[in-house]
Amino acid sequence: MALLAEHLLKPLPADKQIETGPFLEAVSHLPPFFDCLGSPVFTPIKADISGNITKIKAVYDTNPAKFRTLQNILEVEKEMYGAEWPKVGATLALMWLKRGLRFIQVFLQSICDGERDENHPNLIRVNATKAYEMALKKYHGWIVQKIFQAALYAAPYKSDFLKALSKGQNVTEEECLEKIRLFLVNYTATIDVIYEMYTQMNAELNYKV
């Protein structure tokens, strides 16, 4: 669980403004999460998350004061790009990033909630399938969907996944799940606010890749 516990997201302030710098720092440690899933087929999601973090950081670094919050990024780029927005810049990168982050959130929440295949309780296929269908499937074309369906069948045992997530530390399953629940508190709240922001600003795009 060390992978998640070491980099908790900050609690949201009352105005729900998400500071760009601390957000990027926290999520930059998440791509190795996909290594814990064992299958190289998850590598594209890992690469997508890393690439989009890099794109957002490049914009942020040009003017940290101007882009202090994620909300600032969308507002400034909407003014800057006009009719091209939201298909450009950090706005587009954050749109895809939030989907990868949602995959992680739904997957971990499903495991914490005890959702499983009763015939194969130590498999995490049910959890990974739910996460993919809720976070990413609708944005993928038929070929990409088939690739990921194959990957889901190659997902590791839950015990092996939790051990990888704990970086080999000798902790019980319940201790690991408790730390995941702690991680999810601020993480889920943050992802929800980003989704709300895209809805409110009409910045969500539904094209497939």
UniProtKB/Swiss-Prot annotation:
Gene3D superfamilies xrefs: Glycolipid transfer protein (1.10.3520.10)
Start and stop residues of the Sequence repeats: 45-55, 56-66
Chief place where the protein resides: cytoplasm
Signal sequence coordinates: none
Residues the entry annotates as binding beta-D-galactosyl-(1->4)-beta-D-glucosyl-(1<->1)-N-[(9Z)-octadecenoyl]-sphing-4-enine: D48, I49, S50, G51, N52, I53, T54, K55, H140, Y207
Impact after mutating I45N: 18% decrease in activity
Tissues expressing the protein: Detected in fibroblasts (at protein level). Detected in fibroblasts and in various cancer cell lines.
Main function: Accelerates the intermembrane transfer of various glycolipids. Catalyzes the transfer of various glycosphingolipids between membranes but does not catalyze the transfer of phospholipids. May be involved in the intracellular translocation of glucosylceramides.
Subunit record text: Monomer.
Protein known as: Glycolipid transfer protein
Classification of source organism: Eukaryota, Metazoa, Chordata, Craniata, Vertebrata
